[in-house]
Amino acid sequence: GGQYYVKSPEEMERLFPYATEALENTHKIAQRCHVEIEFGVTKLPKFGVPEGYTSWEYLNELCFKGLEERYQPVTEELKERLNYELTTIRNMGYVDYFLIVWDFIKYARDHDIMVGPGRGSAAGSLVAYTLGITQLDPIRYDLLFERFLNPERVSMPDIDVDFCFERRQEVIDYVRRKYGDDCVVQIVTFGTLAARGVIRDVGRVMDLPYAQVDTIAKMIPQELNITIDKALQMNPEFKKVYEEDKEIHELIDTAKRLEGLPRHTSMHAAGVVISQKDVSEYVPLSRASDGSIVTQFTMTTLEELGLLKMDFLGLRTLTVIQNAVHLVEQDTGVKLDMQHIDYNDKKVLDSLGTGHSDGVFQLESAGMKNFMKELKPQSLEDVIAGISLYRPGPMDFIPQYIRGKNRPDTIKYDCPQLEPILKPTYGCIVYQEQVMQIVRNLAGYTLGRSDLVRRAMSKKKAAVMEKERQNFVYGNEAEGVPGCIANGIPEQTANKIYDDMIDFAKYAFNKSHAAAYAVVSYQTAFLKYYYPVEFMAALMTSVIEMPIKVAEYIQVCRKMNIKIL
């Protein structure tokens, strides 16, 4: 009835003229209320460590034990890197955070719930690797901790974890039992009024004919994050009706004012808040349509209030891998450990190069199959690059990458210092981490500061980029940056390298994320090559509710001479 808003004192007086004492009492209560909202302090629960330990001591013990298990021999460089990461984590106040994540991942593995090898920038952390949070060696794949946690930029850590699609909820239930239902809640998201939708909504309120409004809405190009203003520039027909029809002009102007505003609420697919006290002590809560308790604040506001979001994601491919592994053991007696298969198996890599990658994670689209046929991957590093390059923008560099791979003599480095950084990607800047390494190795930046430069480039912050160009080329003694010229790189060459970085950085991909997903891609390719029947059975079971996909995979089985019962 249009009453969902906070009324002014005058409105309340008009509505309740007979209850002046009640109105006065609300004022007295308001005067007695006092609240202080604390920003910048994390509100994570303290992790329960064994008797005789502090959280810091326990984290150290777990990490150094994991270091011994992961590496032989343990070098001084490894110890230094681990100590550096641990110190950064302690200084930023996230010791308990890592223990909490370690604990629920351990629970999942102890209960035969498959966990992904990693996701996002967390795969660049040696601490995460030694704890078993991730399964990807950051040293071997040249992944950077500062891409995940930057000591020069205070930001929340963000460890997103993939679990078996069918059993993800079991892990969330474990966390609820451990920390309490009141301290573990899911997060609200707001669906916004997008270009087409807002025109339809406004048209309905203006009581315009549905067919007419639908025609107008369909004039907006189907492009990600399209706005009405951009559509007016892109579509002359849309602009013409806007300028010539007074009623449509009013419709579109009204829609433009409402565009981007929240339209409805839903629950974040994976985000969960874990807090030290009842979450209602910090933020307002509400009940979702399925009865779940959710925050009324989005994750951005929650982070500002010091509440850490953790993402528990369900990945269908992990369910496929786990079910295939169980079938292999059931049918053949072979107990596969997918973390310790050969990740440089020539037969598996060659199978990807044939383009027969139906059912292989991230590599089964028609375009990706063609790319793999051209690329002919010879290592996991090639698969990582393939996943990173096959996106709008970086696709423009695919011919250059393939040419460099097939004809190394065509690769030209602007200076010798670039070769060790760009050699794995045949002279192309493919990863965000490479931008950071170039800035560090050529101009003497710290890795923390180099991440700030990488962020400025990816967000096209012109003023910051120009300031950093001066620092990159000429140095900045006051800020401790030597610069390229001081390191023997000519001014013209340094400027060219900086220009190239700006071009590539717009599209460069997070290598840590690509590497983790390349591992999942390789695992599915391995199972498909060596255990095709079990893999295809698990794959088809995972899409049993999608008749089109089932039919597609039946055709794949026939091509592989696998009998369908």
Where are these regions (language model features)?
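Noncatalytic, beta-rich nucleic-acid-contacting surfaces in large DNA/RNA-processing enzymes
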Residues: 1-6, 11, 15, 50-565
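Active-site or pore-adjacent capping/gating segments
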Residues: 1-51
